[in-house]
Amino acid sequence: MKGFSNRWNDFPDYIIGITREIWEDRGIATLHHYYSPDIVVRSPSSVVIGNEKVIGATMATLAEFPDRTLLGEDVIWSGTPEDGMLSSHRILSTATHMADGVYGPASGKKLQYRIIADCHAINEQINDEWLIRDQTAIVNQIGWEAKAYAADLIAREGGPENAARPLTPATDQPGPYKGVGNDNEWGGKYADILRRIMGADMAVIPEQYDRAVQSEYPGGTTGHGHGAVDRFWMSLRASFPDATFAIDHQIGRSDAMMPPRAAIRWALHGKHDGWGYFGAPTGAEVYVLGISHAEFGSLGAAETAI
């Protein structure tokens, strides 16, 4: 790969390799090389600029969870080494809450949770990132209710006026990556499925998902079958019935020894004015950042499905 060390076999090898090097091998200082000085890292809870802040956050996490592992489940990617590549990296993380930190007093609880990180890299350096961590899964396993944890964190940050601002179109910062993915058919297929779901066409679920589909959701929840898919998306959309749904990035891939798969980064922006996943309507303006992965295949004579 042009601009990358020949130690990497391909782009997924680079992404998985530097993740292990930074976290598990304690090569935190390598972030000066692997992350650009002015990188923009967006998560639902904040927008962070600069690799120095990333280094500080990494050290704080490892102080609280010193045995953390990051197991790469998949890297769905697009682009070229010459123009830059975007990876959507799905991780299953394990950790023990061994020290006091942002998640409260040490609980000794063993955790398992997922993260998806969309990272743009060129010349062996990441310069733009969108990061989603399953915070509900983390706090629930420690012993918090998600709402109580959020309220406690806001209080510790100095109250609503002083707490970190969540990601919204108003707080987002521009980064160097301007791409929208690729035109692979599997990315297009998954994007169409999600648009139909967000357009209230829930009949697409039994039509396009295998009846034995396994699905993973926030809170560390695993579902099986059409019902779980329907319940999650119905409940989410019902909470924001008039919100605008947008697909910001889509990737599809067909790789040897792998099923066809897709990664979609999407946003839902509008008022919380419906009953659903988040309880009684509050009228609050909400911006939801989401990243979804899907694998496609067929069983017997069945049509290709998720």
How would you label these PLM feature ranges?
Residues 1-306:
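C-terminal and inter-domain tail/linker signature
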